[in-house]
Amino acid sequence: TRTLRQPASLAKLFTTFIALDYLGPGYQWHTEIFSSDSILDGSTRYLLFKGFGDPYLTKENLWFIVNELQNLGLESIEDGLFVDQSYFEANQSNSGDFDNDPLRPYNLMPSALLANFNMVDFTLVPNSATRSVDISFNTLPTSVIFDNQMKLGKGHCPNFMDSVAFNETQSNKVVTISVEGYFPEDCPKIEHELSLTNTNHYF
């Protein structure tokens, strides 16, 4: 008899096969960078980053790009950076469609230009003196603000998300992450990460 079963991660085998067949085993992801004008004088008006789907444009690789630009003689960018996301078609779904939890890293949507998996990594530490929770960040883009309203309370470390909520709002180019709820006061610290729904905050 035939029995229907959940494919789980086995579904990735089909997409991987299609990628190997279409792109070939030697395909390498890349990102192109264009300057608005010559950088012989050490300055340019702007840089354009054109993405081609590289999923591993990590912060370490971004620093490598910065060093390479400096080695080319670039010292200043007058009008900032522009990004080109046109290589991929616009997403027809939202990151929260799967389980209504859009900031979870596994819900990150495909993007032609994606830096550091669009993640923000941080550590939560209880502050018994103020009955609040301190947040320290590994890397936080300047256009992202955390509104920390957490308080100390009862709970268990592995299940701290049961009593803490992260919500994202965007106004112009600034994203605010509101953090509310009760953090387990018996936890010495918790390391956590979120993936922002907008993909341009590292540029």
Positions of predicted regions on the chain:
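Short active-site loop at a secondary-structure junction
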Residues: 2-18, 22, 26
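Conserved serine DD-peptidase/penicillin-binding transpeptidase domain
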Residues: 22-203
